[in-house]
Regions:
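Glycine-rich, low-complexity intrinsically disordered segments
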Residues: 1-158
C-alpha cells in the first residue's frame, strides 16, 4: 500500500488490561497497579526477554470513548477556561481520532503470558494493541518544550 492510500485499517487486541480502575479518571495514576494478559495466539514466548527492561510502552484502545464524540477541532483541555483552545493533536484527550492511547509505564514483573505494570493509565477491560520495551535511545535527544498549561494539567496525573 502506498503512503498516499487512505482507507480503513483493522487491528486486533494482543491482550487485555485488568485494573482496579473501572472508569477513566484524569489523575493519580502513579501507584495504580494493573496486569496485561496476552490473548492467543500470543503466549509467554512473546514476552521472552522483556523482563530485562524496567519500562514498557503500551498502545491501547480507549474502548469506552464514544466514537461519535471524537474531537477533530479545538477545545480547552479538560474544559478548563484558564487554558487555551488547542487542537486535538496538541493534547492527549481520550476522545481522539482512532481512540488510540499510548502510555509508558513501569514493568514490575512478567509471569507467563501476563505483565504486571504500574502507572498504566488504562482502565479494566482495555484492549491492548501492542507492547514495546522502553529504550532510552528513543527518548528525545533535544530539550523537550511544552506550554505552561500542560504542566498544570499533568501536575496530579501521576
Amino acid at each position: 500500500m502506498r503512503s498516499t492510500d487512505a482507507g480503513a485499517y483493522s487491528v486486533r487486541p494482543i491482550g487485555l488490561v485488568s485494573s482496579s480502575r473501572l472508569r477513566p479518571v484524569d489523575d493519580d495514576w502513579a501507584d495504580v497497579a494493573a496486569t496485561i494478559t496476552l490473548l492467543p495466539p500470543f503466549d509467554q514466548s512473546s514476552l521472552a526477554g522483556l523482563d530485562e527492561f524496567s519500562h514498557v510502552e503500551v498502545i491501547f484502545l480507549f474502548h469506552v470513548a464514544d466514537p461519535d464524540a471524537v474531537s477533530t477541532g479545538t477545545r480547552r483541555p479538560r474544559g478548563n477556561p484558564d487554558w487555551p483552545e488547542v487542537g486535538i493533536f496538541a493534547q492527549r484527550a481520550k476522545d481522539r481520532p482512532n481512540r488510540i492511547g499510548l502510555s509508558t509505564c513501569e514493568l514490575v514483573a512478567v509471569h507467563g503470558a501476563t505483565l504486571e505494570v504500574r502507572a498504566l493509565d488504562a482502565i479494566d477491560g482495555t484492549p491492548v494493541l501492542d507492547i514495546k520495551p522502553y529504550m532510552t535511545e528513543f527518548a528525545p535527544r533535544q530539550r523537550v518544550r511544552q506550554p505552561p498549561w500542560s504542566h498544570e494539567l499533568m501536575a496530579g496525573y501521576f
